[in-house]
Amino acid sequence: MDPETCPCPSGGSCTCADSCKCEGCKCTSCKKSCCSCCPAECEKCAKDCVCKGGEAAEAEAEKCSCCQ
């Protein structure tokens, strides 16, 4: 099954809930278990994390608001 596409691919608020299966979700309101820019072991990433950094940024340069 193909990954779902979020209605806000470039950021912004959307109805991305706990069951979000979007690939590369950039929804600032997404409450997925973890942001793609955070390490898998980051337990603080459970809710309201916001990925900061564009696609052009290096992977190391991407920061998550809950993972400082």
Curated annotation (Swiss-Prot):
A divalent metal cation 5 binds at C35, C37, C38, C51. Keywords: Acetylation, Copper, Metal-binding, Metal-thiolate cluster, Phosphoprotein, Zinc. The modification N-acetylmethionine is found at M1. A divalent metal cation 4 binds at C34, C35, C45, C49. Residues 31-68 are annotated as: Alpha. It holds the Pfam family Metallothio. The modification Phosphoserine is found at S33. This is Metallothionein-3. The gene is MT3.
